[in-house]
Amino acid sequence: MQRHELPPGRRSPATRITLLAILLFLLFGLRSFAGYAIEIEWWKELGQLNTWFSMLYYGIAPVAVATLVAFLALWISHARALKFAGTGLGEHKLYARISTLALLFLAWFIAAGAIDTWTVVRFAGSRGLPAAAAGWHDNIFNKPLSFYLFDLPFYSLLRSYVLAVIIFCVLLYWIAARGWQLRFRMPHLRDAQELDPAFFKLEGGLESRFLRGAAVIGLIALAVRFYLGRYEMAYNEHGSFLVGIDYVDQNIGLPLQWLVIFACLAAAAFVAMGRWFLAALMALALVVDFAAPRIVSALYVRPNEISLQRPYIETHIHATRSAFGIEQNVREVEFKAKPEAPIDVAANKPLLDNVRLWDTRAFHDTVTQIQALRPYYVFADTDVDRYTIDGQYRQVLLTPRELDLRQLPAARANWINPAFIYTHGYGVVLAPVSQITPDGLPVLFIENAPPEVKASSLKLTRPELYYGEVTHEPVFVDTAREEFNYPSGESNVTSRYEGKGGFPISSLGMRMAAAIREGEPNILLTSYLKPNSRMMIHRKVEDRLHELAGFLEWDSDPYLVITDAGRLVWMIDGYTTSEAHPYARSVDVPDIGRVNYIRNAVKATVDAYDGETHMYVFAPDDPIISAYQRLFPDLFQPSDKMPADLRRHARYPETLFRAQAEIYRTYHMLDPQSFYNKEDLWDLARHTTAQNGGAEPVTPTYVVATLPGEAKPEFLLLIPFTPRNKDNLIGLMVARCDGKSLGDMVVLQLSKQELIFGPMQIGARINQDQTISKDLTLWNQQGSQVLRGQILVLPVGNTFLYVDPIYIQATEARMPQLKKIVLAVGNRLIYADTYDQALAQLSSGAQALVTEATAPGSSTAPKAAAVAPATGDARLQSVRDHLRRYRELASQGKWSDAGKELEAIEALVK
């Protein structure tokens, strides 16, 4: 055979294709490989390389296996279609190669769309877990919670995948068979009229053994779908009073599901025998399955709903409480509050010394003005915590001083600044919550740069923050350039990194990978990188944990802790969530989404200097985290491995508490009839936000208080409730944070017969007090603005103390100063310049600034608090009765009638 030589300078087609492939790889693949190289070094830095390989495997393997299975099914379908058309793949080799690649892509498309890898991975991780691990069991189907969290989602996914493969196989078979038949006929057709339209119909192939086989498999898969649908009835919603299986589902729906399953299997048998018409009779079973439950519900259940649905409502109540962790961990206490009971200031000094006078928003604005030092320093967040300072248990506010070069665009424009020089924040501001300077500013225990620590028991040895809430760019440390540390007068103090954070970056390969990943060629060209230089990435705490354990939900509010050694360590809460808890109501959780199961399973720590990251399991009985522990054994540690100085600062997370409070306000009703009728529905208490009467729901508040039956104050997370559409207090939900009590919850249930003022009512009394209202109006008109914090509700002894700090700030400068303190106990208001003055009046019972409760809207001026003389039991009881009726009428807004009760009281005490 004669060979044809290519002219000089011309390349063969194969060479051109090879060069094009190399070019495409350089354009699209090199950056991915560079990213993988950097990520591998990051995982090695954390000591979690095995975890990364496991995640890579778990992410690829399920889709790869599903792709292979789908490809085999599609290839067989394609081959049988060609055989039906009278040809075969062996006769068309180029077509065979192209079609094989196309089928492989189609198989991947089906697998990637149908397979959720984490559903498969969680199912694999749950194998071998004890069935009773979660402590909840479905008595209708006799299934543990793990079946609904892991098994049912996996089986449902598998069913959907099989049905998708069957549908694509049938379509492929028809298209390929008819396409090749048409190709063979086209050369013999003289015009389009000779092509019979019936040729394109499917009926001609119904006798194909392949189509019958595919239909049989599809009908069996459909039977499996209805079988699994029995369990999915546990998610049926029946109005606002029931989720899960109800009377109709159990007595009509479940038996009919077996009828439909039998019909599907019978149809599969008829199709296998070629009796397609008989298989179509399956539709009758579907009609019965659709209509019968609705008829029974309308004609029999609805007229007798509460009596028939009672056991199912009870199941729903307990399932929902269990799903949100309020069935096992909540202790409900009847709190017999006495609103007018005096407060012993001396006996409650540890508690009163920790009353939070600084609202976090006001504190943030003030600290930003007096402690930011430079424009590029920001205080991103203020957190509430507790420390033992010089022997005293103190509640404090703490905020880190982080560096954010986005505040200085000019400095950021030079690549050297963010990468080598401005690498870290510096120091924190820490203040006790209840101490105020004469100027109305917070007393600071830690301030300035370098840090000035004013408490002997606190120390700060590593104030640098390389990892934080606003750190967003990679940096290089231990380089030839010194780093900016903190400002000092007109100059700056520099430093060199002395820790072990980051990974080596000095080699040519790593520098090239970093340059490609970041799109910054200067990384490859710079002379500042030394043999010991390291690169820090994923420095934002939340992003770091999402990279490390993205299968968990992470709280959006990390908080900083000062360890005994003086290091700064971030703590952040991680959650396991699901929408698969049967019989349970779902709620929307901020930053997470809609869930009906949540646990605070993990608490993570990130060293602000080194980036050292650990995850500790705090819910070992949670089946989801147990499955992840089996999958990633190197990633998690038990909670008792957390260092003691960090464990002291673990707290109950606000995100979880909000979700539980939202559920509890309805699901505190355990009686099915009360629940059905919503007889005792609660709301989150509201509070006044401005002098004009604006209101919004209160947010959970960290406080230091003493629970009934406890000997000393402790760190608590608290939220008050009111009856639906009312403002008087009906209960307080409290989560404990200290020591072995961490995670325990207490609900103080108040008497429905005793009117206890809520935050909104206290706010209304404050706004309508003539003296206070006059001051607020005056301050809002003199180039200043009044700010109000959230009114605190604190249980003290057998009564409640309400605290409302009032701040003032200039309209052109946001630096709030604490101007006044309002304390309220029962009917008394104390309005003072300082907290110490208010406590002195509370202790002495002084009346100069203590006013009587005046009905909101009343024009009566405040009077000295009246005390009923003890001149006889009958008269005293009468005073109590009138006072009780006054409170009831005041809570309902019936001020005219309430005024008459006050007049009756005045007549009795004169």
Curated annotation (Swiss-Prot):
Pfam families: UPF0182. The keyword Transmembrane applies. It comes from the Bacteria. The chain crosses the membrane at residues 17-37, 56-76, 101-121, 157-177, 210-229, 252-272, 276-296. PANTHER family: UPF0182 PROTEIN SLL1060. InterPro entries: UPF0182. Its main location: membrane. GO terms for cellular component: extracellular region; plasma membrane. It comes from Solibacter usitatus (strain Ellin6076). It is found in: Cell membrane. Keywords: Cell membrane, Membrane, Transmembrane, Transmembrane helix. This is UPF0182 protein Acid_6445. It is a multi-pass membrane protein.
